[in-house]
From Swiss-Prot:
Single GO cellular component term: endoplasmic reticulum membrane
Subcellular location(s) of the protein: Endoplasmic reticulum membrane; Microsome membrane
Species: Mesocricetus auratus (Golden hamster)
MF terms (GO), sorted A to Z: arachidonate epoxygenase activity; heme binding; iron ion binding; oxidoreductase activity, acting on paired donors, with incorporation or reduction of molecular oxygen, reduced flavin or flavoprotein as one donor, and incorporation of one atom of oxygen
Protein known as: Cytochrome P450 2A9
Binding of heme, residues: C438
Its membrane topology: Peripheral membrane protein
Family matches, as Gene3D superfamilies: Cytochrome P450
Length: 493
């Protein structure tokens, strides 16, 4: 009895301290935007639908406007909803909002290192180098285009071997797309049966799913406690160590055969730059940043494109009249006697519009990647202290009725003008906007066009059930949306 009483007293004392700390912090938060009243320590957790955070935020924006504050646990997050608010922050005040916000799942691995999850001078140095080096290795140019064409040709060969039988396209696409970025980062591609490669893809996929899940959200809010408790987060923590160890091995392989006068891949280029910068005390070029930047590129270059293509298949089967028009444009512009080239897109406005609409409608990461203020900032009359987390809701731009007709419906005409030509839309920002837009956007655009057109040049898509049975709605999963698994057939043309 005495022991139980002491435990109860300890718990009550702990909660009391948390409440006092919470109240004390509110006095020093600056003049943050309004929002729902938070509870001590747990914040607004009980007011959010943890299975569909995006919908909860949309509802809150209708009540509090385009700029408001929610508390994820004890941590305040300023939410930017709609084109105007996001543009003002990420473009007009780009420097102030250029920091990377907190995401506990990914911070467990990256710990503020690497190009994607760092801030300040580190992020600037690594970003400049990464963009220049990716360009040197042909990203957005003919060099990487040829690698994509090679992988696309191998993918066609594998799909033909299925002989029209129903298959799950997920694994085929995931391995194919990942091998493109592998050739840039490592200098070569993996064998599709390589167990280490398959396990690597599995761990990255599990990490992304966990980060978006309700348990992942709890971990994001209360990671200081949950990292010591049993649960699925322990497997994720274990996986992060294995991912880091994998990349360390890759870096050591390159170090052992490095030629300072000839870079074979991204890792070599980074190692050479490390050598050149070794006497610079402010240099961010070190092994830790190399390992984490290489992992950043591998993450970014693997899952998003393959998921978008899988969702594209589902939509094209749901709307066969759209697939038919894409086939017609491919036949007219490219024909059947050569592989598609990226420059073909200039003569294929309808296909480009379809690809854009697939990305818009999928809206796979509606909350974007969190930002934070790198200095005390005034925004729309509110005072945001340095290191305030900010969520620019990119999904709110992709579904804005001011820019897209019937945004809840799939309609490639959103991206075509009255003459049937492709038009630019300011709110179409699937790769974010401003100083921290996705540095792999050029590669992703090239992959989406070449993989999709190459597949549709060779196959028609068939769903094994009736068209009305196709559920083409992305499934909300916490902070993101996922594509349901399904089977389909690729029928040779």
């Amino acid at each position: 009895m005495l022991g139980s009483g002491l435990i109860l007293v300890a718990i009550l004392a702990y909660l009391s301290v948390m409440v006092l700390v919470f109240v004390w912090k509110q006095k020093f938060r600056g003049k943050l935007p309004p929002g729902p009243t938070p509870l001590p320590y747990i914040g607004n957790y009980l007011q959010l639908n943890t299975k569909d955070i995006y919908s909860s935020i949309t509802e809150l924006s209708e009540r509090y406007g385009p700029v408001f504050t929610i508390y994820l646990g004890p941590r305040p997050v300023v939410v930017l909803y709609g084109y105007d608010a996001v543009k003002e922050a990420l473009v007009d005040q780009a420097e102030e909002f250029s920091g990377r916000g907190e995401q506990a799942t990914y911070n467990t691995l990256f710990k503020d290192y690497g190009v994607a999850f760092s801030s300040g001078e580190r992020a600037k140095q690594l970003r400049r180098f990464s963009i220049a080096t990716l360009r040197d290795f042909g990203v957005g140019k003919r060099g990487v285009e040829e690698r994509i064409q090679e992988e696309a040709a191998y993918l066609i060969k594998m799909l033909r071997s299925t002989r029209g039988a129903p298959i799950d396209p997920n694994d085929y696409l995931s391995q194919t797309v990942s091998n493109v970025i592998s050739s840039v980062v490592f200098g070569d591609a993996f064998d599709y049966e390589d167990k280490e490669f398959l396990e690597l893809l599995h761990m990255m996929n599990e990490m992304n799913k966990f980060a978006a899940s309700p348990v992942g959200q709890l971990y994001d809010m209360f990671h200081s406690v949950m990292k010591y408790l049993p649960g699925p987060q322990q497997q994720i923590i274990k996986n992060t160590k294995e991912l880091e160890d994998f990349m360390i091995r890759k870096v050591k392989q390159n170090q052992s055969t490095l030629d300072l006068n000839s870079a074979r891949n991204f890792i070599d280029s980074f190692l050479i730059h490390m050598h050149e910068e070794k006497k610079n005390p402010t240099s961010e070029f070190n092994i830790k940043n190399l390992v984490m930047t290489s992992l950043n590129l591998f993450f970014a270059g693997s899952e998003t494109v393959s998921s978008t293509i899988r969702y594209g298949f589902l939509l094209l089967m749901k709307y066969p009249e759209v697939e038919a028009k894409v086939h017609e444009e491919i036949d007219r512009v490219i024909g059947r006697n050569r592989q598609p080239q990226f420059e073909d897109r200039m003569k294929m406005p309808y296909t480009e519009a379809v690809i854009n609409e697939i990305q818009r409608f999928a809206n796979l990461a509606p909350l974007g990647i969190p930002r934070k203020t790198i200095k005390n900032t005034t925004f729309r009359g509110f005072f945001l202290p340095k290191d305030t987390d900010v969520y620019p809701i990119l999904g709110s731009l992709l579904t804005d009725p001011k820019f897209f007709t019937s945004p809840k419906h799939f309609n490639p005409q959103n991206f075509l003008d009255d003459r049937g030509q492709l038009k630019k839309i300011a709110a179409f920002v699937p790769f974010s906007v401003g100083k921290r837009f996705c540095l792999g956007d050029g590669l992703a655009r090239m992959e989406l066009f070449l993989f999709l057109t190459t597949i549709l040049q060779n196959f028609r898509l068939k769903f094994p059930k009736k068209l009305e049975d196709i559920d083409a709605s992305p499934k909300p999963l916490g902070f993101s949306r996922i594509i349901p698994r399904y089977t389909m057939s690729f029928l040779p043309i």
